[in-house]
C-alpha cells in the first residue's frame, strides 16, 4: 500500500530517555562552559523542547555563545543517551521484529541528535533495517527543522523516492509533520501514550508495530532471517 514506512525513533522503536537523564546532561553542559550553578528552570528549558529564541535568551543571561552552548548540550545529551542504551536503560520495544515483515522501504525521522540515532541503531543491530535515518545536526538551525516541520521527513521521502508513505509516531508533532508533508500517519499508543487525547487526527491509531502489517502489507521473509 505504501512505498515507504517512516518511523519516529524514541517512544516508537526504542524506549524514551528519562527526563532525569536529559536534565543531568543539560546541567553538565552548563558546568562544562563555566556555569557552575545554573537556574534549574533554565536547565529544564534546554533539556527538552527548547526553541531558538528561548535558547538565545538563556545563553545571554549567562554570557555564553548560543551556538557553542548548543553544540555542547547536544554532545552531552547524546553521550548520556548512548550510555543509557549500553546500560540496558534504553532498549528496543518487544515488537521490533515486526519491521522485517513490512512490505515497504523503511526510514527514520527523529528530533534527537543524528549521533544518538546512529549509535543506538548500531548498538542494537538495527541499522541494516533502514535505508535512511535522519536525526538533528548539532546546530541551532536544526531546532526550527524539528517536527512538526516536514523538513527531515521530506528529505527521507526524497531519498527513498517514495510517492506514497506513512509516518509512525507517538507525538502530535509526528502527526502534524506527516500532514505538512502530505502523507499518512499512524499514532502508536505505547503505554506512555495510552490515555492521551489528540487534538489532531492521524490516519490510523495503532496499539503496537504489529498493527502495521495489515496496514502496509506483509513482505516475504526468510524464516532463518532475524534482526
Spans of model-derived segments:
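Asp-based, Mg2+/Mn2+-dependent phosphohydrolase catalytic module
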Residues: 2, 114, 120-227
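Internal, well-ordered alpha-helical segments in soluble enzyme and binding-protein domains
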Residues: 55, 95, 116-117, 152
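Conserved phosphate-coupling serine/threonine residues in phosphotransfer and NTP-handling enzymes
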Residues: 110-112
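Surface-exposed amphipathic alpha-helices with a cationic face
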Residues: 96-103, 175-179
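Generic recognition of short, well-ordered alpha-helical segments
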Residues: 17-21, 119, 180
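N-terminal helical cap/lid subdomain that shapes the substrate entry/recognition surface
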Residues: 2-100
Amino acid at each position: 500500500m505504501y512505498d515507504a514506512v517512516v518511523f519516529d525513533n524514541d517512544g516508537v522503536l526504542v524506549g524514551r530517555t528519562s527526563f532525569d537523564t536529559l536534565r543531568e546532561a543539560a546541567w553538565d553542559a552548563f558546568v562544562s562552559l563555566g556555569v557552575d550553578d545554573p537556574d534549574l528552570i533554565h536547565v529544564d528549558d534546554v533539556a527538552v523542547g527548547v526553541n531558538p529564541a528561548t535558547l538565545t535568551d538563556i545563553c545571554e543571561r549567562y554570557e555564553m555563545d548560543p551556538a557553542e552552548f548548543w553544540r555542547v548540550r547536544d554532545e552531552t545529551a547524546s553521550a548520556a543517551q548512548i550510555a543509557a542504551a549500553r546500560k540496558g536503560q534504553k532498549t528496543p520495544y518487544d515488537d521490533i521484529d515486526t519491521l522485517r515483515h513490512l512490505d515497504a522501504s523503511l526510514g527514520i525521522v527523529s528530533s534527537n541528535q543524528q549521533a544518538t540515532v546512529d549509535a543506538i541503531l548500531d548498538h542494537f543491530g538495527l541499522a541494516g533495517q533502514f535505508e535512511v535515518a535522519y536525526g538533528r545536526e548539532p546546530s541551532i538551525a536544526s531546532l526550527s527543522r524539528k517536527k512538526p516541520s516536514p523538513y527531515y521527513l521530506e528529505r527521507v521521502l526524497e531519498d527513498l523516492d517514495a510517492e506514497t508513505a506513512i509516518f509512525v509516531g507517538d507525538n502530535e508533532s509526528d502527526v502534524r509533520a506527516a500532514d505538512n508533508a502530505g502523507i499518512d500517519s499512524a499514532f502508536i499508543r505505547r503505554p506512555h501514550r495510552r490515555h492521551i487525547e489528540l487534538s489532531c487526527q492521524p490516519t490510523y491509531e495503532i496499539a503496537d508495530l504489529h498493527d502495521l502489517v495489515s496496514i502496509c502489507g506483509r513482505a516475504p521473509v526468510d524464516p532463518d532471517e532475524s534482526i
